[in-house]
Amino acid sequence: MAKKLLGVLVDVYNEKAQPLEIEDELDSFYKILDCTCIDIVRRRIGGRFKKAFEIVCDDEGLFREPQKISAIDNLGQPQLVGNIFITGTVDVDGNLTSLTKYDVSYILSKVQKMSTRKFINGYPMLTQCEY
């Protein structure tokens, strides 16, 4: 039985952001991200007091239509495209870790409804996401 992993899902296609607990298995990531190829990147989230998190993302998000930005930096530049799942940093064995309740609140405070030229009504997007 796989361990459970608590993270924040930013689903740009269904236009929602929410905490979600999943099994820490590859198929679970494919299912919640609605994709067939993932990548895991480390990004700092926040303004002055940035904190590092791992972000599981759709590695082929740019090839999907419509292309929807899921994360931007402090200047509004796109960082990630497609659905994303944000977790804690990896442990000493390289395994993803769950978010704390504080981390969930912190991340959700950085998710805002943002508009783009193609999507003028806006949808949830992670802001203040940087290298």
Locations of the language-model features?
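Domain-length accessory/inserted modules outside core catalytic folds
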Residues: A2-Y131
